[in-house]
Amino acid sequence: MLVCVFVALYTMMGLLTDIKQLQSDFDDEMFEFRAITKDTWQRIVTKHTYPGGVDEETIESHPPTFETLFGTRKARQAYPEQCNCGPKSEGCPAGPPGPPGEGGQSGEPGHDGDDGKPGAPGVIVAITHDIPGGCIKCPPGRPGPRGPSGLVGPAGPAGDQGRHGPPGPTGGQGGPGEQGDAGRPGAAGRPGPPGPRGEPGTEYRPGQAGRAGPPGPRGPPGPEGNPGGAGEDGNQGPVGHPGVPGRPGIPGKSGTCGEHGGPGEPGPDAGYCPCPGRSYKA
């Protein structure tokens, strides 16, 4: 149980740390976003207020604002010639500088500014570095040390086929080659002339007959013969021994009932006393 509590606490601490880091990253990103939007808006207002361009000192002394933007529009519409807001001439030389204005009152010293935040990513700097008022262009630094050798690149495509070179000098006589394959058989030659007549051969007479040899092995059985005719009936055989008694048969059906018999003869006296007479008449 205690281990589970420690694990839960450790997990919660990790989650809180991640949330805190996420909030810090979000604040940094929002600061960069506000700085970029503020700078972009400043450039848009400056470009609209001073279409012909202006130096940075004028922008710093009289920074354009949202009210200046709409005030300039009204002045252009009301007094286009006095404010010199009409179409700008092209190719005209600059006029003489005007008289210096009255000296203004000295402003109060400003408070020390807060420490600056980290700069914008390099991609944003690369996009806005040509706009006036952007980052300071620093001279390139010294070249860094030589880096390590890169990996071997993939093999290049196959080159064009080279030209045929000049024929080489004639070589010396080579050694004997290996034995070739056997040739095809030649054509049959002509028949030769008949040979000389041979000497007469020895004549032999037939000898006496030899003894009979042992009998040969038994041959295979012959084919089956045709079926024979029906034989004659044989004599009657003797009477066989009596068989074993069979099982008792099923009881037969009951016969018809006989006729009633007549009255039997009186039996002998058993020695009993005579029966008493009846006391009433039927």
From Swiss-Prot:
GO terms for molecular function: structural constituent of cuticle. Residues 214-224 have a biased composition (Pro residues). Keywords: Collagen, Cuticle, Disulfide bond, Repeat, Signal. It comes from the Eukaryota. Residues 1-24 form the signal peptide. The keyword Repeat applies. Residues 86-282 are annotated as: Disordered. Residues 235-244 have a biased composition (Low complexity). The keyword Chaperone does not apply. Residues 95-124, 141-269 are annotated as: Triple-helical region. Residues 170-180, 225-234 have a biased composition (Gly residues). One of its GO terms (cellular component) is collagen trimer. Collagen polypeptide chains are complexed within the cuticle by disulfide bonds and other types of covalent cross-links. Belongs to the cuticular collagen family. Nematode cuticles are composed largely of collagen-like proteins. The cuticle functions both as an exoskeleton and as a barrier to protect the worm from its environment. This is Cuticle collagen 8. It comes from Caenorhabditis elegans. The gene is col-8.
